[in-house]
A protein has these predicted regions:
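Acidic, Mg2+-coordinating phosphoryl-transfer loop and its flanking beta/alpha structural elements
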Residues: 1, 122, 130-164
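A structural signal for isolated positions on well-ordered beta-strands in alpha/beta enzyme cores
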Residues: 69-71, 102-104, 134, 155
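Substrate-recognition "cap/lid" segment bordering the active-site pocket of phosphatases
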Residues: 78-132
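Short, acidic loop-to-helix structural element flanking the phosphoryl-transfer center
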Residues: 40-71, 78-82, 116
Length: 164
């Protein structure tokens, strides 16, 4: 198959974003994905999740306005990484950020709380590479952690009264 050439301005823009590191952190479950016929730990069913178009539209607006990169930071077990990547691609293909993102997930069989796993990934991988200008998440414990880290523009897109 022939590779398509990317227009020069698009190529430069993409390179600039990655070097510049301006980004937003986006959670998956409960934020951009709504569980559809599965429990929170049924990783083999993540491909059936429904997208939350309203939230994706908000993310699209932030990406366009700030010319930033999307960092998906998920508490999902890495056992479903391939399905998660495919789900992201399939459900964001209509958005400008569909090919301009990175995914970080918890290690396989890591059962620690989301806030602990995400904070660890943040300090080890995200903070050294990216200038985070906002966060989209749904879990109260994780939202609190982002606030404690003093990240700007922490946006709750779920029901803050539901915990598991």
């Amino acid at each position: 198959q022939d590779k398509q050439l990317v227009p020069l301005d698009e190529y430069i823009n993409t390179k600039r974003k990655k070097v510049n590191g301006i980004s937003i952190i986006v959670d998956i479950d409960g934020t951009i994905a709504e569980m559809n016929g599965r429990g929170p730990f049924e990783w083999h069913k993540v491909s059936h999740d429904k997208s939350r178009k309203f939230v994706l539209d908000m993310i699209e607006g932030v990406v366009k306005e700030n010319d930033c990169f999307v960092v998906y930071l998920s508490g999902r077990d890495a056992i479903c990484e391939d399905d998660t990547r495919k789900w992201i691609y399939d459900n964001t293909c209509d958005y400008t950020f569909s090919n301009d993102w990175q995914l970080y997930m918890r290690n396989k069989n890591d059962t620690r709380k989301d806030r602990i796993v995400k904070e660890e990934i943040f300090w080890n991988v995200v903070a050294p590479k990216y200038n985070v200008i906002g966060v989209f998440d749904d879990r109260p414990q994780v939202l609190q952690m982002w606030h404690e880290l003093k990240l700007p523009n922490v946006i709750c897109v779920g029901n803050p009264f539901i915990s598991f």
